Each structure stands twice: as C-alpha cells, then as structure tokens.
C-alpha cells in the first residue's frame, strides 16, 4: 500500500485523532498539580492552599528534640550527691560543748587530768579554759584564785588574760601521794643544812588533817618553798638557802620560848589528832573580824593564800625548832620577813578556804606537828 492511497490516509487521520483525544484527557485542569515553588514556602497567590506539599522534617529538628531529654537526667544526680555531704558536718561541730542557760559548758574528765600539773607562777588563759580548770591544774582553790586576780562571779575569763597562780617555786601544790613522795625526796636533800625555816617547812607537806567542814584533808598542806620567796627554784638554790638563812634567824636561834599565848579567844571545836588523817592542830571558833595574835615572838616566813584549803595563811618562825601556823584568816595584817612580838595582832578571823568562821592553829617542832594544847596555858 502506497503512502498516497486513500486507505493509508484514513488510517493516519484516525491514529492522529486517537492520539489527540488521549492527550486531551491527560490535560484536564480540574486538579492542577502543586507547584514546585511551594516546597520553599513561596506558592503563587492563585494556588490552592490545600494542595501544598509539606517538606519532611530536617535532621537538625530531630537533634534538637533529643537534647532536652539529656539535661533533666543530669540535674537530679548532682543534687543527690550534695545533700548527704552537708548533713553530717553540723552535729560534729557541736559535740565538744553543751549549752546551759545560754552559757557554754565544757565536758572535761577531771579524773584524767593531773591535779597541780602546772608549775608556773602565772598562767595565760587559752580558748576553752575555765577558772575551775586553771585552779585544778595549778593546785589552787578556784575561789582563792578568783580573789587573788579580782575576778567576780560568774568568773568569766578572756583569751590571753594572765592570771597569778602563785606557784613561783616551780613545785605543783596539790594533794595526794604523788606530791608527798616528791616532797619527801626533796626533804632528804634539804634536811642536812642548818635547821632553819626551809628545813622545817619543807617537811610539812607530808602531814595532812581533816576537819568537820568536809574539806579534803589531802590538800591541807603547809607551803614548802614560800619562806625563800626571793629564790625561784628552791631545790636548785639549796646552798644559797643554807648560807643566808642562819644570818637572818641568828637573832632567834638560841632564844627559848618561855610562854605561849592563845592566838585568839573562842571555843576549841576541833582537837589535835596524832593518827594519820587526824587534825594536826586545833580549830577555834569565833566571829568574823575577831583578832588573831602571834602566839610568841618570831618572824613571818609566809603570808599568802596560794595553798588550797588553807585560805589566807600566816606562818611564823619562832626559832630553829618551832613554827606556828594560822589559817582561814579574813585579813592578814603582816607581811613576809616581818618581825612580830608575842600578842601582836597579825590577822582577823575569817572563813577563807573553809565553810565556817574559825582559826586553824598549828605548832610544829622540828617540822613535826605537836599538840598545841600542851604548850598553850590552861584557861
């Protein structure tokens, strides 16, 4: 069949018609395709908004959604580790002290603290110190220590404050067996020089007594170094004491005591006891301010209140053999190294170092306590 025949022409026209109809059907504009420009959010004004194609979420959006999930997990872990570390710190700082009536109370076990362990003549207050603690380690009565340093109740102290504790000799002044053994050893060194006040007084700490007031008798000891007040350490200066004392006491060395006088008026309420732990003198009751006189001529070798339990104490050396002691005085009217006469007023009666107004009176012969009633005239 040739290209110009009528049949070929008809078939060609029919084929073109079918192709035209098919193309016309595919070009229907009732559902226009979404413009490509809507992907970037720039659709034309006449474009149907319902046919916009929403782009898929970006990778950056997904990563930002995961980060908030990590942050809340880390925060609770930090808080949980901080709280247990703060709680146990607070009660530990409060354990050493207690508060009572707005004041700090220190809990000390005094049974484990050596009494009289401090040997200096002054003491500097440190943090945590109390007057009772200082009195304990220096071998003093806290009331006497307060009086000596003009400290009023309730006995408040300041850090750095210097207190006069009276242990200038370097020997702790306490009761108990430890100090007795130390004094006995010291006595063995001093006893061989001339019989002077140093020898007589040094032997006295080994002798104790008790009284009805309930004071501890172990602390009632006469001083062992006060007569040599110019010497700081008596054991070291034994040669000095043996050379100087005979010169001072030579005026009374050979003077016998013909008559003893009663040191005060009043009733004897405690008598002499020779047994161990007994009263090594006599106690005479009286009224505060009552006169105390020297029982015989002599020289004052000690006047002070450094010894716990004695209060204001005066010791008079009458000769190389005899001493007399007057304790619990209210006011002392003589000073150390002062010469006194028999019957001279040396003090007024009081209650320092004890619970009632009284005079504790002792006579010692060559450092040994004797019954004063054997020497005093009967009345």
Swiss-Prot record:
- What is its membrane topology? Lipid-anchor
Q: Where is this region: 4 X 8 AA tandem repeats of Q-Q-P-Q-I-Q-P-V?
A: 66-97
Region of interest (4 X 7 AA approximate repeats), ranges: 205-252
- Annotated signal sequence is 1-25
Covalent lipidation (N-palmitoyl cysteine) residues? Answer: 26
Effect of knocking it out?
Cells are shorter in a single mutant, double envC-nlpD disruptions have defects in septation and cell separation and form long filaments (8-fold longer). Cell length increase is more exacerbated with a triple mepM (yebA) or ygeR disruption (15-fold longer) and further yet by the quadruple disruption mutant (envC-nlpD-mepM(yebA)-ygeR, over 21-fold longer). Quadruple mutants are less sensitive to ampicillin lysis.
- Lipid conjugation (S-diacylglycerol cysteine) is at 26
Return the sequence repeat spans.
66-73, 74-81, 82-89, 90-97, 205-211, 227-233, 239-245, 246-252
LysM domain location, by residue? 121-165
Q: Does the keyword Membrane apply?
A: yes
Q: Which InterPro entries match?
A: Cell_wall_metabolism_enzyme, Dup_hybrid_motif, LysM_dom, LysM_dom_sf, Peptidase_M23
Keywords for the protein's UniProt record, in alphabetical order: Cell cycle, Cell division, Cell inner membrane, Cell membrane, Lipoprotein, Membrane, Palmitate, Repeat, Signal
Instruction: Report the protein's function.
Output: Activator of the cell wall hydrolase AmiC. Required for septal murein cleavage and daughter cell separation during cell division.
Q: What is this protein called?
A: Murein hydrolase activator NlpD
């Amino acid at each position: 069949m040739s290209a110009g025949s009528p049949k070929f022409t008809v078939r060609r026209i029919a084929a073109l018609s079918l192709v035209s109809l098919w193309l016309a059907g595919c070009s229907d504009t009732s559902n226009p395709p979404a413009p490509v420009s809507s992907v970037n959010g720039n659709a034309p004004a006449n474009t149907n908004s319902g046919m916009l194609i929403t782009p898929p979420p970006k990778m950056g959006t997904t990563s930002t959604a995961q980060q908030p999930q990590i942050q809340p997990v880390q925060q609770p872990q930090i808080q949980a580790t901080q709280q247990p570390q703060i709680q146990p710190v607070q009660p530990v700082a409060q354990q050493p002290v207690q508060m009572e009536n707005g004041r700090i109370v220190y809990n000390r076990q005094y049974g484990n603290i050596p009494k009289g362990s401090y040997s200096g003549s002054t003491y500097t207050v440190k943090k945590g110190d109390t007057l009772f603690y200082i009195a304990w380690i220096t071998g003093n009565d806290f009331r006497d220590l307060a009086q000596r340093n003009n400290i009023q109740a309730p006995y408040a102290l300041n850090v750095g404050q210097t207190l006069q504790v009276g242990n200038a000799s370097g020997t702790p002044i306490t009761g108990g067996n430890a100090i007795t053994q130390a004094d006995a050893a010291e006595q063995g060194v001093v006893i061989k020089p001339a019989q002077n006040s140093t020898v007589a007084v040094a032997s006295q700490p080994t002798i104790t007594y008790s009284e009805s007031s309930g004071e501890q008798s172990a602390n009632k000891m006469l001083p062992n170094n006060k007569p040599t007040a110019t010497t700081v350490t008596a054991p070291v200066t034994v040669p000095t004491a043996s050379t100087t004392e005979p010169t001072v006491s030579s005026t009374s060395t050979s003077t016998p005591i013909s008559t003893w006088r009663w040191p005060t008026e009043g009733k004897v309420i405690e008598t002499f006891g020779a047994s161990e732990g007994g009263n090594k003198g006599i106690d005479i009751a009286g009224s505060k301010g009552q006169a105390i006189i020297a029982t015989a001529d002599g020289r004052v070798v000690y006047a002070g209140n450094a010894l716990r339990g004695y209060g204001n104490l005066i010791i008079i050396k009458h000769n190389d053999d005899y001493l007399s002691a007057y304790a619990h005085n209210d006011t002392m009217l003589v000073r150390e190294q002062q010469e006194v006469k028999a019957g001279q007023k040396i003090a007024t009666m009081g209650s320092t170092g004890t619970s009632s107004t009284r005079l504790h009176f002792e006579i010692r012969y060559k450092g040994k306590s004797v019954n004063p009633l054997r020497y005093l005239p009967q009345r």
